[in-house]
Amino acid sequence: MSTVLSVKDLCKTYIVKKNSNNVLRNISFELGDGEFVTVMGPSGSGKSTLLYTVSGMDAMTSGSVNFAGRELGTLSKKELSKLRLTEMGFIFQQMYMMKKLCIFDNIVLPAYQAGMAHSEANKRAEELMRTLDIIETAEHEINEVSGGQLQRACLCRALINEPKVIFADEPTGALNSKAAADVMRELIKANRGSTSIMMVTHSVRVAAMSDKVLYLMDGDIQGEIVLGKLENEDTLPERERSLRNWLVERGW
């Protein structure tokens, strides 16, 4: 398996009132092509910060992040912006959709910006919205839809450019069980189509659907468990039990 994301000795420090807060400490890991990796850990362990930093949304303090052969730390703002637009997809807890645009236009905009033909982009956006059961929200503004609908719209937007990697921070956190299942079904479908996924979640059941889980505590990776591809949903309960036992051993 070739590597799409290679992280070495990554550190992230915030300075607050002249005090240093070392949120990430010498983090190293790899994400392979078509691999689905989840990061778990207690609240405040640095999970979301890790996701933002390795995706170039937040600057690293030191270390190396290599995305598909390019060192993020050496890219200009313009180069990094283009890379995020065309090769990365994002589902973050605070997605900054444009308030003046309807849901459909928010979803399709990244495809237009990436140079996709408008007819193709419109067709793809409509297909994604139908699959995730939010086509009725197409002309609604973002303040006119539920949190669950907005989260599914974020997934549509993340998928529209068929990115190399999707970075997802609690993608099912605001959803009911049906909507959560729909989101995970689409993420797994994208992953089987060779898109790599790096996800943060507190849900053991959701994490058990991934190939590998990293355990983050106090800004450091304390261990990993390899679950392999989820080939049959009937095996999910056993995967969930194995993962839960592994997490408990680490103080979960």
Regions found by a protein language model. Name each.
Residues 140-143, 160-161, 193:
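Conserved signature/switch motifs of ABC ATPase nucleotide-binding domains
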Residues 55:
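Helix-to-loop junction immediately C-terminal to a conserved catalytic motif
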Residues 141-145, 149-151:
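Conserved ABC ATPase signature
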Residues 63-71:
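Conserved ABC transporter NBD signature motif
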Residues 40-42:
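The feature captures the beta-strand-to-loop junction immediately N-terminal to the Walker
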Residues 101-109:
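Short coil-to-helix segment of the ABC ATPase nucleotide-binding domain corresponding to the Q-loop/switch region
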Residues 166-169:
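Catalytic Walker B motif of ABC-type/P-loop ATPase nucleotide-binding domains
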